[in-house]
Amino acid sequence: MVMKFRMVKFARIPSYNQLFSGDPVWATLEVGGIGMDGRSMVTKNCYRFLHTLENMGPAPEPNLTVLYSSALPENFKKYAAKVSINTSSVQYENDDVMKPVWGDDYSICCCVSATQTGKEMQFFGARANLLKALLYAINGGMDEKLKTQVGPCYAPITTDELTWDIVKPAYLRMLDWLAGLYVNVLNLIHYMHDKYYYEAAEMALIDTHVKRSFATGIAGFSHCVDSISALKYAKVTAIRDESGMVYDYKTEGEFPKYGNDDDRADDIAKWLLKTFIDMVKKHHTYRDSEPSTSILTITSNVVYGKATGSTPDGRRAWTPLAPGANPSY
């Protein structure tokens, strides 16, 4: 089964492969978990699936995900940890958090999203680069790499010293534009998928009246939080080229960083996440699906970083973004 999943290849245009690393097919296989009655759901096949990473070598897909609970058998936890250390290819999700919502018969859809098996489906939504949106807000929609107008032609910020009070209104305006564009493009993609029945055979295996979620995602999350934190708590000076476009930043002073158990940074993270999903929810979603968002763990951070210039948190231009919800250090 694992071998079959590894053999699947989609015919895709080069620009698609430039955006998604590893030629993904979005296949996730879950192992482990604890039943609603308290019994372990670990079987011999759980060990066999994990062992494929050792006898066949690591691979991004199928995405092997351990539904983790402290109540899992000790030997299984040790074996999963051993495979993780040797292959760096195992994903862990908190079964204790998800089980009260979805029960014990749930699957991980795409990458990280729980869905009740046979009763729910997800329209995959990739992710929006909220860090690049911050740079667009500062430069009035001008792209710092292409040197052309890509976002809406809003007034750029012209002050040399950048503060959050100055940048925030422009950023909110740019985020609102991005959320609308994001949902519109996803609606088009999902409509065309249904029109050409790419997944017809899979859909035949689940309930007729299925609950649909409309997934969105965020790229550059920790850098975005840290950049806002720098604007709030440090001194950030814009460095401009001869045309006046900001291409770099000089940041002086300390500022709280995401991932250090500092409420000042964590409050920014919560604000950013809630603000963006609220903007997404303002728009009609395909087939009345329920909007959701996630901060994914997959590796598109590299290709997103190649398109994103220097940022106020100190990250250099065109370097990888921190993956998913991970801190930027």
Kindly label every feature range from the protein language model:
Residues M1-Y329:
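Conserved catalytic cores of very large enzyme subunits
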